[in-house]
Regions:
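Structural preference for solvent-exposed beta-strand-turn elements
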Residues: 1-182
Length: 184
């Protein structure tokens, strides 16, 4: 794996994935982000085994593809320190991810990409298109009633149903009940 990417691209992608990087580190691999590189794109994936976020960024110069994992928090903190507009060179050297910029050379330990848990993608499932603002409104209008770290895990989430061109979201903490409906 050997490629170049701008600071802005990598920082944006890392920031998007940091929300699901495991903080308790029950498994060391969950503190890492998965790198997948092909001719024109970098896919970063992070998971906490409940949620998974993947981002796709455009790379500026491709030398070789590949897969690896690197510590998400350390990588994010490091990339934020680079100069605006910097082009960052990432490449694998054995079990290490080497990073070179105009300001210096850095080295991060990696874990094998084969150990990274990836959700199975369902083929041929039903899909629903919804705008970002509509989804945000749907969640906002019901999320206040969700349980927060309740021992009854089924109360800690949001129920979403799609029927007859309507999307309904429902949440409860056993004391409050919230329902929101959007026509699509």
């Amino acid at each position: 794996m050997d490629f170049y990417i701008t600071k802005e691209e990598i920082v944006s992608s890392l920031n998007a994935t940091l929300g699901v990087v495991e903080k308790r580190q029950t498994l060391p691999i969950l503190a890492n982000v998965l790198f997948e590189v092909d001719e024109s794109t970098l896919r970063l994936t992070a998971t906490d085994l409940e949620s998974e976020i993947s981002t796709i960024s455009t790379i500026s110069n491709f030398k070789s593809g590949g897969r690896t994992t690197a510590p998400a928090k350390k990588l994010s903190e490091l990339c934020r320190l680079f100069k605006e507009g910097d082009e960052i060179h990432f490449f694998l050297d054995g079990d290490n991810l080497k990073i070179e910029t105009s300001s210096g050379k850095y080295n991060l330990s990696t874990l094998p990409s084969e150990d990274f848990p990836v959700f199975e993608k369902e083929e041929g499932g039903n899909t629903v298109n919804i705008t970002g603002p509509n989804l945000k409104a749907l969640i906002y209008k019901t999320s206040f009633a969700m349980g927060n770290q309740d021992w009854r895990h089924y109360l800690n989430g949001l129920y979403i149903s799609v029927e007859d061109n309507n999307i309904t979201s429902v949440a409860t903490d056993a004391h409050r009940l919230a329902l929101s409906l959007i026509h699509i």
